[in-house]
Amino acid sequence: MWKNIRVACLLLVLLIVVINAYRDQNQDWNQPINILLHPINADGLPTTEKYIQQLQQNDFAEVKQYLEKNSQQYRGQSSYFMIQMGRELDQTPPKMSEQPSILNNILWSLKFRYYAWKQHESIDGSPSLTLYLNYYDPKNTKELKHSTALERGRIGSVNLFAAHKQERQNNVVLVHELLHGFGATDKYNLANGEPLFPIGYAQYDKRPLYPQTEAEIMGGRIPLSEDKSKMPNDLEQTVISLLTAKEIGWVQ
């Protein structure tokens, strides 16, 4: 019985997804873009909770400025981004399967949409995109698992460190997933995380090619050699490439 109820709920979410698919793939960049952020104490630690309680909307001002600056560059006029701090949530989004497959990915996608539907309250309004920020104390969690986002559904699950010294690097991860939500694709090798040449390079025509000094935002890392790279320290060390701008609709 409970299995049938769960299947029915997932089918309902799938129907909603189909109805909203057209809207989600046709973002009007002339309208204000409202990004809703829901912080989550993902490791349940008091130190993480203390960090979340100190978070302010202004902590994400760099994200807003970065997006507006780059939209101005490609569109000839700036899109207006509103970064809204939402409610802290108790439940983390569903995690992707450790054994990826087409079926597992589809099931995870439906579960994630169902999670987002259950978490939404009227006070949240109708955001253009919702990101669930899963915070972890870096003293307890040394390495974060891969963040994910869905264009069809305009939702993302972003894993971040609960530390002020990590905030600018957190913003790099946040913008990467945010752009995923608007249709940008990964530009790195999924097997090893290294940026793909040339689409994952910010300076693909640089001579000598290495070391690079910037990261393409969807490439994720700064290439130092053919098989070595590093995480950018902040958004100032990243660029949005023409290809990424086309994918999200800033360039026709």
Annotated model-derived regions:
Residues 39-41, 135-137, 162, 186, ...:
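A mature extracytoplasmic/lumenal domain signature
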Residues 47-59, 150, 162-171, 210:
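Extracytoplasmic/periplasmic, Sec-exported soluble proteins
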Residues 59, 63, 170-174, 231:
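Stable alpha-helical elements in mature extracytoplasmic
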Residues 2-10, 15-124, 135:
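Propeptide-to-catalytic entry region of secreted or membrane-anchored zinc metalloproteases
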Residues 169-187:
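Active-site recognition of the HExxH zinc-binding catalytic motif
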Residues 1-5, 10-17, 147-151, 156, ...:
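Metalloprotease/metallohydrolase-associated module, dominated by Zn2+-dependent proteases
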Residues 44-50, 140-141, 225-229:
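Short, solvent-exposed loop/turn elements at domain surfaces
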Residues 88-172, 189, 193:
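Acidic/His-rich structured neighborhood in mature extracellular/periplasmic domains
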